């Protein structure tokens, strides 16, 4: 789940009004808990007791996996089914009306998407002050993190991933939705290494013949027409970004980069990039179809699906548009299980028929999800019928046994798979023992688990962990895309690059808001994001005195993980949070009505834009700002999932079914490995806790010291081969460079 701190997309069209959260809202419901296991608890609020973990609705919160300025992402487990989910928790009280509007639009768009390579939204829970989005958990992390750790992909592996990306993006375009922030940080991997596109915070609906004018996205992935300030139809900017992504997958670096925004802009507008010697002719050919300066001559995704390179190894299985299957809401086995949980057939039918994003629909959908360990749908002991799905051979989506497409996908999966690290997983009990939902009491209970990070403390994001959700931007108004939580936290790394790191190593792109545009050289922007027709249509060139955004290193610029020119930014208006007025001068009288209460909302008041300086001068000055305060402290139970009590019966490490991501193996007893790990981490000056018998949660640096803060976990796992154990390292927060340095140091000390 990307979720990144980013500028919220502007309202490109009049249709950008408040979305409808609809049936997902349940603020009028009060405490509800699993009567079998947890006693009475509030279904739609967070609560905690001395011996239990906090809960939200039917979900037990396990740990924080991402943080943004006004949002958090929690890894949680659905009590009734045992499935893991990611819950995005957004503090609505911190958001201005424009930000709320964009948040509701994102939710509305996610409700309409049902593709195996797009993160699925299961449930929406809304209270007066908080919005909870229950989404699919992509446990294997970001494609970005893989590229940082392993470098470029082989073309066969990149092809398997890229087919899924193209299928998902084409599906969005078929539904008249443009993503506008496609990049490696927003591509997640599930337990089977299938792509999951996340972070629709900048997405918008488009109409043929109607132009969009909002400049948003990460500069290295942004199309040239965006740098020129031209209006665009929509899909063509995603197609350019797909070309950059393909180049990145195959080469491990970016086709367009620069020491500052001015240099990057010039390179993008030239459209010239280096072709690595190892890139095949067919791959080079398809790249040239994506990276075309003239958007009118850029290829379409329908043409790409017929390209030779994308279908190599898939003879007879040409990539075709995804056909969304008819929803199977009549699975009697799942319905019977839900009846055993305490739901009535009537409410099940109503929720599924009306497609309400409430607890009933979420339970039904989660019962049909695969378990990561078993790979089968449904709960253990239940022969749940599979939901009908289209064949992978035609749609190039998630892997399915038996097809040649799956052969390539399995090969890719073996390379990229990262297992989740929780040893406390226990699937749902057989049908007769399924926990029952408890009755709902009235009353709207507010959050008690923990406060959302404040504006100052929220400048850094902590957390994607596996959800490779990218970190929050350290500066400007990420409230404008509140539904973004960052993983992991990034601070600019002042340390030198380790010698064992490749010079072209990937660096993360932050997310920012371009808050103002020049009034004299750029079309005036109304607070609703519409352009004033009295202006011109181009962004002026960058100021010659552009601020340097990152120090160069080698032939290509080498930026820290939080590098600014790789940040997503957006040319919308930003409300002055202190004055409570829009940047255009329109007074905001309060947040918009919740879309769960009103399906139509009046447009935000408009006003005259105030005069500003050059766009790129303003942007670069903001992008060069750095947060000097210490990031929000990671301490206590928030350090890891590990404040969970040990399972007293657990005497062996977790069995790692897919061991391809394990780099260190040993035949030592697991207890001896843990002892060696404790010594090695102590020698590396890490502060460690042991939340589970075979898991260490470690912190290094930070607290005002010279070294950046790094938060990671080390787990000893049992491999399928008898008598062989593996050591898994997982970065939770901090820069990739610092993490890799620590892993190398600890691994050398282990002498495995």
From Swiss-Prot:
GO molecular function, one term: protein serine kinase activity
Residues with the Phosphothreonine modification: 214
Subcellular location: Cytoplasm, Cytoskeleton, Microtubule organizing center, Centrosome; Cytoplasm, Cytoskeleton, Microtubule organizing center; Cytoplasm, Cytoskeleton, Cilium axoneme; Cytoplasm, Cytoskeleton, Cilium basal body
Principal subcellular localization: cytoplasm
Regulation of this protein's activity per its record: Activated by phosphorylation on Thr-214.
UBA domain span: 324-368
Top-level taxon: Eukaryota
The UniProt record lists the keyword Cytoplasm: yes
Tissue expression remark: Isoform 1 and isoform 2 show similar expression patterns in the central nervous system and are present in the same subsets of neurons including pyramidal and non-pyramidal neurons in the cerebral cortex and hippocampus, cerebellar Purkinje cells, and interneurons and motor neurons in the spinal cord but not in glial cells (at protein level). Isoform 2 is the major isoform in brain and cerebellum. Also expressed in spleen, liver, small intestine, colon, kidney, tongue, testis and lung. Isoform 1 and isoform 2 are expressed at similar levels in heart.
Active site per database record: 181 (proton acceptor)
Enzyme Commission number(s): 2.7.11.1
Positions of the UniProt region annotated as Disordered: 1-36, 385-615
Chain positions found as Phosphoserine: 423, 543
Protein's name in the database: MAP/microtubule affinity-regulating kinase 4
Source organism: Mus musculus (Mouse)
Gene: Mark4
């Amino acid at each position: 789940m990307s979720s990144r701190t980013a500028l919220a997309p502007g309202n490109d069209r009049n249709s950008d009004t408040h979305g409808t959260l609809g049936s997902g809202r349940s603020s009028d419901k009060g405490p509800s808990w699993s009567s079998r296991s947890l006693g009475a608890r509030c279904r739609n609020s967070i609560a905690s007791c001395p011996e239990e973990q906090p809960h939200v609705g039917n979900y037990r919160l396990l740990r924080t996996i991402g943080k943004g300025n006004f949002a958090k992402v929690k890894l949680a487990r659905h009590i009734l089914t045992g499935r893991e989910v990611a819950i995005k928790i957004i503090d609505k009280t911190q958001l201005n009306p424009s930000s709320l509007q964009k948040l509701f639009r994102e939710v509305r768009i996610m409700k309409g998407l049902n593709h195996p390579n797009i993160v699925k939204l299961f449930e929406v829970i809304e209270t007066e002050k908080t919005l909870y989005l229950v989404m699919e958990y992509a446990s294997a992390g970001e494609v970005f993190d893989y590229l940082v750790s392993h470098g470029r992909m082989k073309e066969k592996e990149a092809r398997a991933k890229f087919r899924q990306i193209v299928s998902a993006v084409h599906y969005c375009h078929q539904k008249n939705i443009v993503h506008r922030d496609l990049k490696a940080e927003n591509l997640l991997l599930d337990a089977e290494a299938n792509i999951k596109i996340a972070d629709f915070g900048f997405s918008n609906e488009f109409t043929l013949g109607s132009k969009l004018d909002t400049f948003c996205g990460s500069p290295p992935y942004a199309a040239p027409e965006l740098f020129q300030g031209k209006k665009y139809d929509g899909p063509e900017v995603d197609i350019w970004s797909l070309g950059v992504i393909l180049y990145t997958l195959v080469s491990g670096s970016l086709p367009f980069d620069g020491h500052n925004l001015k240099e990057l802009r010039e390179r993008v507008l030239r459209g010239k990039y280096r072709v690595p010697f190892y890139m095949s002719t067919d791959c080079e050919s398809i790249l040239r179809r994506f990276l075309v300066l003239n958007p009118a001559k850029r290829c379409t995704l329908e043409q790409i699906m017929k390209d030779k390179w994308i279908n190599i190894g898939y003879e007879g299985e040409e990539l075709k548009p995804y056909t969304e299957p008819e929803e199977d809401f009549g699975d009697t086995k799942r319905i019977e299980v839900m009846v055993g949980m305490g739901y009535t057939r009537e409410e099940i039918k109503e929720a599924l028929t009306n497609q309400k994003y409430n607890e009933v629909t979420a339970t039904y959908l989660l019962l049909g999800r695969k378990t990561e360990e078993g790979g089968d749908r449904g709960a253990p002991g239940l022969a749940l019928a599979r939901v009908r799905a289209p064949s992978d051979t035609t749609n190039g989506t998630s892997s399915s046994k038996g097809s040649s497409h799956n052969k390539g996908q399995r090969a890719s999966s073996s390379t990229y798979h990262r297992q989740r690290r929780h040893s406390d997983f226990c699937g749902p009990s057989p049908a007769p023992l399924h926990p029952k939902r408890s009755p709902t009491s009235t009353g709207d209970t507010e959050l008690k688990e923990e406060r959302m990070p404040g504006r100052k403390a929220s400048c850094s994001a902590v957390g994607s962990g596996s959800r490779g959700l990218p970190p929050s931007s350290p500066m400007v108004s990420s409230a404008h895309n509140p539904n973004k939580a960052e993983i992991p936290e990034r601070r600019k790394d002042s340390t030198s690059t380790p010698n064992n790191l490749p010079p072209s190593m990937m660096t993360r792109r932050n997310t920012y808001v371009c808050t103002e545009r020049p009034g004299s050289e750029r079309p005036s922007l109304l607070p609703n994001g519409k352009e004033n027709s009295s202006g011109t249509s181009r962004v002026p060139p960058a100021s010659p005195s552009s601020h340097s955004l990152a120090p160069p290193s080698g032939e290509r610029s080498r930026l820290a993980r939080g590098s600014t020119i790789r940040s997503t930014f957006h040319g919308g208006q930003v409300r002055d949070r202190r004055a409570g007025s829009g940047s255009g001068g329109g007074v905001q009288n309060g947040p918009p009505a919740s879309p769960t209460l009103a399906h139509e909302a009046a447009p935000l008041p408009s006003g005259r834009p105030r005069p500003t300086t050059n766009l790129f001068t303003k942007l670069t000055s903001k992008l060069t700002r750095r947060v000097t305060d210490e990031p929000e402290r990671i301490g206590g139970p928030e350090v890891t999932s590990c404040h969970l009590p040990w399972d007293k019966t657990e005497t062996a490490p977790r069995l790692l079914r897919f061991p391809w991501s394990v780099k260190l193996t040993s035949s030592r007893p697991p207890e001896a490995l843990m002892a060696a790990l404790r010594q090695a981490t102590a020698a590396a000056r890490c502060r460690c806790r042991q939340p589970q018998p075979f898991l260490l949660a470690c912190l290094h640096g930070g607290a005002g010291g010279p070294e950046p803060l790094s938060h990671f976990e080390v787990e000893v796992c049992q491999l399928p081969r008898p008598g062989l154990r593996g050591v898994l390292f997982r970065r939770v927060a901090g820069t990739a460079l610092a993490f890799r340095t620590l892993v190398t140091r600890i691994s050398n000390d282990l002498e495995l």
